[in-house]
C-alpha cells in the first residue's frame, strides 16, 4: 500500500482528529471518486473491512492498494461462466456491461453515486425489471498476514494456505438460512434505487482451492440452493450455488441514500475527512509516520 499522492502539511493538515485538504491538495484531487455499490457500505457502516475514514481516503485517492491477484483473477474468469450457467438454470437473461467501454460507470449523469451492476434484466418493452449481483465466495478460510498496511495471502511454495476447510461458509449460513452480508445488500440496493426498481437477485458460488488454482477449468453442474444446514453439499465435487431473490422498499432505502449523500457533501465536497478512530490513525500513519498528535 502506498500513500504517495498527497504531502503532509503541503496538501493536507491534521486537525481535530480529521484530515483537511489545503488549496494545494485540492488542486491535486482533480476529481474525487463516486460512491459505488462497493463503497457505500463503508459509509453506512455495513462494510466490516472498511471504515468511513478509509472509504474517504479511497474516494480522495490517498492510497494505492496492492490487490492480490489470486482471487481477483479467478473471479474475473469465473463470474461470466457463473452468469451464463445461472441464466440457463433459472431461465432469465441479464445484460452485462464492459466496464472500460462505459468508463466504469453506468450512472454517469449522477454526480454522487455510480458503478456497474453485474447484469440487468429487461422486459419485452425494454424496461429494466431486475438487477443481478454475482459473488464468487471462498469455500475455505485462508491464512492471511498483515504486511505493508494491508492483509495479504500467506503462501507456501507459491501457493495460498488453507487454514480451515469450509471455513468460508460461516458468514453465509445460520440455522439453514442463507445470510447475505449487509454490505452486499447495500450494494445491490443502491443499484436498484438508482434504476427505480425493487427486485434483484444474488447469484453466489463458493469456490474451492482447486478452482482458484485453475479457474479456466471450472465448470458448474450443481443445482442452485442444494445444501444442508451448514452449507455443505451432499455430493462430493459439487459446487455450493446460491440463487436468492432480493427486494427493497425504495422509500425505506432512500433514507440510507440521503445519509450517504449528506456524508459525501460534508466530507468529499468540503474535503474534510470523517473523524478517525484509533485504528484509522494507526492505519494512516503507515503512510505519514510524522503525523502529529
Residue ranges and their predicted role:
Residues 1-293:
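Accessory terminal regions of nucleic-acid processing enzymes
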Amino acid at each position: 500500500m502506498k500513500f504517495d499522492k498527497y504531502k503532509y502539511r503541503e496538501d493536507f493538515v491534521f486537525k481535530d482528529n480529521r484530515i483537511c485538504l489545503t488549496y494545494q491538495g485540492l488542486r491535486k484531487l482533480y476529481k474525487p471518486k463516486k460512491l459505488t455499490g462497493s463503497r457505500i457500505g463503508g459509509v453506512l457502516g455495513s462494510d466490516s473491512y472498511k471504515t468511513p475514514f478509509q472509504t474517504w481516503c479511497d474516494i480522495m485517492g490517498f492510497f494505492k492498494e496492492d490487490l492480490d491477484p489470486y482471487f481477483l483473477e479467478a473471479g474475473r474468469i469465473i463470474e461470466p461462466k457463473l452468469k451464463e450457467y445461472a441464466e440457463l438454470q433459472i431461465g432469465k437473461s441479464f445484460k452485462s456491461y464492459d466496464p472500460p467501454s462505459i468508463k466504469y460507470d453506468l450512472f454517469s449523469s449522477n454526480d454522487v453515486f455510480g458503478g456497474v451492476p453485474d447484469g440487468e434484466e429487461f422486459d419485452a418493452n425494454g424496461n429494466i425489471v431486475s438487477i443481478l449481483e454475482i459473488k464468487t465466495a471462498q469455500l475455505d478460510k485462508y491464512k492471511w498476514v498483515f504486511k505493508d498496511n494491508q492483509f495479504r495471502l500467506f503462501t507456501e511454495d507459491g501457493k495460498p494456505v488453507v487454514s480451515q476447510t469450509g471455513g468460508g461458509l460461516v458468514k453465509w449460513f445460520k440455522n439453514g438460512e442463507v445470510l447475505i452480508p449487509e454490505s452486499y445488500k447495500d450494494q445491490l440496493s443502491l443499484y436498484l434505487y438508482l434504476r427505480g426498481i425493487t427486485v434483484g437477485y444474488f447469484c453466489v458460488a463458493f469456490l474451492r482451492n482447486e478452482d482458484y488454482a485453475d479457474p479456466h477449468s471450472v465448470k458448474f453442474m450443481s443445482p442452485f440452493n442444494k445444501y444442508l444446514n451448514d452449507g455443505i453439499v451432499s455430493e462430493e465435487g459439487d459446487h455450493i450455488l446460491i440463487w436468492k431473490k432480493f427486494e427493497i422498499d425504495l422509500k425505506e432505502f432512500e433514507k440510507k441514500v440521503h445519509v450517504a449523500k449528506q456524508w459525501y457533501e460534508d466530507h468529499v465536497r468540503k474535503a474534510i475527512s470523517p473523524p478517525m478512530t484509533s485504528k484509522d490513525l494507526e492505519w494512516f500513519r503507515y503512510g505519514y509516520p510524522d503525523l502529529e498528535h
